[in-house]
Swiss-Prot record:
Keywords for the protein's UniProt record, in alphabetical order: Ribonucleoprotein, Ribosomal protein
Pfam family, one: Ribosomal_S10
Function noted in UniProt: Involved in the binding of tRNA to the ribosomes.
Protein species of origin: Brucella anthropi (strain ATCC 49188 / DSM 6882 / CCUG 24695 / JCM 21032 / LMG 3331 / NBRC 15819 / NCTC 12168 / Alc 37) (Ochrobactrum anthropi)
GO cellular component: ribonucleoprotein complex; ribosome
Protein name in the entry: Small ribosomal subunit protein uS10
GO molecular function, one term: tRNA binding
Amino acid sequence: MNGQNIRIRLKAFDHRILDASTREIVSTAKRTGANVRGPIPLPTRIEKFTVNRSPHIDKKSREQFEMRTHKRLLDIVDPTPQTVDALMKLDLSAGVDVEIKL
C-alpha cells in the first residue's frame, strides 16, 4: 500500500478506555512495521443540559448535567498489508467509536 495513509478517529465518553484503545492500535501498527503519527488529542466536546429540580414549582432551582466526548486522531503512514489485517482483527473496548478513512 504505497503512499497511502490510514486516518483513525476515536471517540468515547471515558478517556481511560479511549487511551487504552489508542495504545492498543499504536502497538499493533508499530509491531507490523508501519509508522504512526499521534495520538493527537482533539478538543473535548462538552454538552450541558439544564433541567428544573422540581417538577412543579421553583424555577430558580436548577440542576446541570454534562456529557463529555473525548476524541483522538491517529495517522498510520505507509501501512503494510499485515498492518491492515491486524487492525481488522483488533478487538477494542465497548464504548469506543472508531472511524477509519483510507
